[in-house]
Structures are given as C-alpha cells and as structure tokens.
C-alpha cells in the first residue's frame, strides 16, 4: 500500500484554463476575541476566508492551509486591523504555488452589550448588535470595513400631527360652551382623552458601514454603535420598569422621524468616519411593507453602493 496520499489539486490540471477571482470557504465557526477600551469579550463568529486563483492551470487551492491559519489566528490574536492584515498576508504567502496575490476575510458575529435602563438604577439587560467585518488585500492595497446593525424606535411625524388634530377636535367639542376652564378640568380631560388617537410607531433598524483606518488600534465597534444610538436617541431598550417605559415614550415623542430623517441624522453624525454608508428600515405598523432610505458618499463606487443597498455584500 502506498504511503503517499493523492493530491489531485497538485497532480491534475484544471479542465478549463481560466483564473478565478476568489476561492475559499464560508461559514467557518470560530471563537474570536474583541478587545476595545470599553469592551472585552470572546464571541462566537462565522468566518469566510478566500484567496484569488490567478494561475489558470492550477486545479484548486489548499483549503486546509487557510483553515489552519484562521484557526491559529483565532486562538492567538484579538480582532484588530493589525491582526487581520497579518492574517491576510499569511493566507497569500501560503498560496505562492497558486500564484495568489489577494486575500479576504469576513467575520460575522453578534456583539453582546449590557445596557442600563433609562431611569431605574441598577436595572440592565443584554442587547445584541449584529456585526460584519470585511478585510481585504487586493493588488497590495489593504482595506477594512465594519458594519453594525442597530435597533431603534421610530414614531411617524405625520401620524403624530393627525393624532394631535383629533385630540384638539375632541377637546373643542367637549369645552366649546365653556369660555372659562378650570385647570383641573383640563387635566382630567387630558388624562382620559389624550390617547384618543395615537401616532403609529415601530421597531426600526439601521445598518451603518464605515472604513477603519489601517493604523487604528482596534475596530471601534462599540464606539460606532454608541455614536449612532446617540444620533437616533431612541435605541430599543432591554430591561424596563414603568418609569423607564415612560422615559422611552418621552424620547419617542421628542424625536419624531420619517425614515428620511433617521438616515440624515445618522449620516450627519458620521463626519469623523471614512466612507460611511447608511441604510435604515422602518418596519411599518401602518403598512404591510417597510420604509427604507440609503445614504452614501458621492465618491463611493456604484458597485459598493449597490451591494450595500441590496444586502448582497457577500
């Protein structure tokens, strides 16, 4: 019995002599460490790793090499621009016999963050933020982007105005024959009738993608999330008591917004970030469909804008 195992990726020729843009694996389970100034945690991620295959005569790449490099990287390094770019170079170096010159890594995971209640001291709960990290080295150029998804509440300004009109009409009907009103009577009427009509509101989602500088010490995930939530002002809550629910109702009333308002708020707040792209979606309670808006720098390539808009970034 021969001791040498066959390797057809080396001994066989490709049936069609053509280069391939990317070859590799998707959805590899991997523990990753996130270490940022205000966040340190090990999380479960799914990773995609690929290299290019420019040599038309080579039948296939060495996927086990990529897997082992990724596995070793996950054990040895926290996720950072420096560690990701080092991994990309190792992937390229491991495929010199395939003439590979480019590599990319994508990580998908949920950033778990403990969030305090708005008012009640000592009350908090966990909130999950889906994160996508994409690092590439193509033609010697390094690029790293992060994308976060943030849930928030949106209340329709038009619906709020219509509701106020109905409440006003009800008030006038009740007190039209009373030129002088007691404050207590008005207060009593409001307690019973201020919800005569209520504006529609809904859970909403913001997707924000930015480019991370190659020399950044970390990805800045939580900083970006906090930044966007601060711009929106109505992030969904975790654990609440009645006082927190009341405070949340006040925030929604003070921050009425169409989907266009939400997108503009976020984009205007991202002036310190590079290549920012925004997609917001309001899961309408009035309609069976969603309202959406996108925002991207004018300089962004059309294909990049399209992939972000359609969610086809893979």
Swiss-Prot record:
<feature type="region of interest" description="Disordered">
    <location>
        <begin position="290"/>
        <end position="314"/>
    </location>
</feature>
<feature type="compositionally biased region" description="Low complexity">
    <location>
        <begin position="291"/>
        <end position="304"/>
    </location>
</feature>
<protein>
    <recommendedName>
        <fullName>GTP cyclohydrolase FolE2</fullName>
        <ecNumber>3.5.4.16</ecNumber>
    </recommendedName>
</protein>
<dbReference type="GO" id="GO:0046654">
    <property type="term" value="P:tetrahydrofolate biosynthetic process"/>
</dbReference>
<dbReference type="InterPro" id="IPR003801">
    <property type="entry name" value="GTP_cyclohydrolase_FolE2/MptA"/>
</dbReference>
<keyword id="KW-0378">Hydrolase</keyword>
<dbReference type="GO" id="GO:0003934">
    <property type="term" value="F:GTP cyclohydrolase I activity"/>
</dbReference>
<comment type="pathway">
    <text>Cofactor biosynthesis; 7,8-dihydroneopterin triphosphate biosynthesis; 7,8-dihydroneopterin triphosphate from GTP: step 1/1.</text>
</comment>
<feature type="site" description="May be catalytically important">
    <location>
        <position position="156"/>
    </location>
</feature>
<dbReference type="Pfam" id="PF02649">
    <property type="entry name" value="GCHY-1"/>
</dbReference>
<feature type="compositionally biased region" description="Polar residues">
    <location>
        <begin position="305"/>
        <end position="314"/>
    </location>
</feature>
<comment type="similarity">
    <text>Belongs to the GTP cyclohydrolase IV family.</text>
</comment>
<comment type="function">
    <text>Converts GTP to 7,8-dihydroneopterin triphosphate.</text>
</comment>
<dbReference type="InterPro" id="IPR022838">
    <property type="entry name" value="GTP_cyclohydrolase_FolE2"/>
</dbReference>
């Amino acid at each position: 019995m021969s001791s040498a195992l066959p390797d057809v990726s080396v001994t066989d020729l490709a049936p069609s002599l053509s280069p391939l843009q990317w070859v590799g694996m998707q959805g590899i389970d991997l523990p990753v460490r996130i270490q940022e100034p205000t966040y340190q945690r090990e999380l479960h991620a799914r990773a995609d790793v690929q290299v290019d295959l420019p040599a038309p005569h080579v039948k296939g790449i060495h996927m086990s090499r990529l897997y082992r490099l990724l596995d070793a990287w996950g054990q040895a390094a926290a996720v950072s621009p420096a560690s990701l770019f080092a991994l990309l170079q190792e992937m390229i170096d491991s495929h010199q016999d395939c003439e590979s010159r480019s590599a990319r890594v994508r990580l998908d995971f949920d950033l778990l963050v403990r969030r305090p209640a708005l008012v009640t001291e000592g009350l908090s709960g966990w909130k999950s933020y889906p994160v996508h990290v994409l690092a590439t080295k193509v033609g010697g150029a390094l690029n790293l982007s992060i994308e976060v998804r943030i849930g928030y509440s949106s209340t329709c300004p038009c619906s709020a105005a219509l509701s106020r009109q109905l409440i006003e009409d009800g008030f006038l009907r009740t007190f039209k024959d009373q030129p002088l009103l007691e404050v207590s009577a008005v207060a009593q009427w409001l307690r019973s009738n201020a919800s005569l009509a209520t504006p529609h509101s809904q859970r909403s989602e913001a997707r924000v993608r930015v480019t991370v500088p190659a020399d950044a010490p970390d990805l800045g995930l939580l900083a970006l999330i906090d930044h966007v939530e601060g711009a929106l002002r109505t992030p969904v809550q975790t654990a609440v008591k009645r006082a927190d629910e009341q405070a949340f109702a006040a925030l929604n009333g003070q921050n009425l917004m169409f989907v266009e308002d939400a997108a503009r708020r976020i984009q205007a707040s991202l002036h310190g970030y590079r290549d920012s792209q925004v997609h917001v979606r309001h899961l309408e309670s009035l309609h069976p469909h969603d309202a959406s808006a996108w925002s991207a720098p004018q300089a962004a390539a059309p294909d990049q804008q399209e992939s972000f808009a359609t969610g086809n970034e893979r």
